[in-house]
């Protein structure tokens, strides 16, 4: 199993969500996050552009079976890419175990309901 974390533009979230659902990735978490980097973003407030080093993004967190890693990465990349600086990053992290609290099931079987198996 792997945990895939993707930091994407807020404006691309709906496209990424739809791409993940189309790739049969049925569950993920997402969070509003801020980062600081060399690239600055301008914010417009009452018609004035303010320069800021704080960059607002969405962090998507998905745990998938090893066989679904590449299709998940490709779905995120295709939907999140604009070709501009600041499109984001994807991180792939090993997951040692997964436990379904309700049943005690362990391993990749705990990731999905039996009727959702693909």
Which residues are covered by each model-predicted region?
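Positively charged, small/polar-rich N-terminal and surface patches that mediate targeting and assembly
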Residues: 1-118
């Amino acid at each position: 199993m792997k945990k895939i974390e993707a930091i994407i533009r807020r404006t691309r979230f709906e496209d990424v969500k739809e791409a993940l659902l189309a790739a049969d990735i049925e569950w993920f978490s997402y969070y509003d996050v801020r980062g600081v980097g060399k690239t600055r973003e301008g914010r417009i407030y009452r018609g004035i552009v303010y320069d800021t080093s704080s960059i607002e993004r969405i962090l998507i967190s998905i745990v998938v079976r090893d066989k679904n890693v590449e299709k998940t990465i490709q779905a995120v990349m295709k939907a999140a890419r604009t070709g501009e600086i600041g499109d984001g990053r994807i991180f792939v992290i090993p997951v040692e175990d997964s436990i379904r609290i309700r049943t005690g099931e362990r391993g990749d079987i705990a990731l999905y309901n039996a009727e959702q198996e693909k």
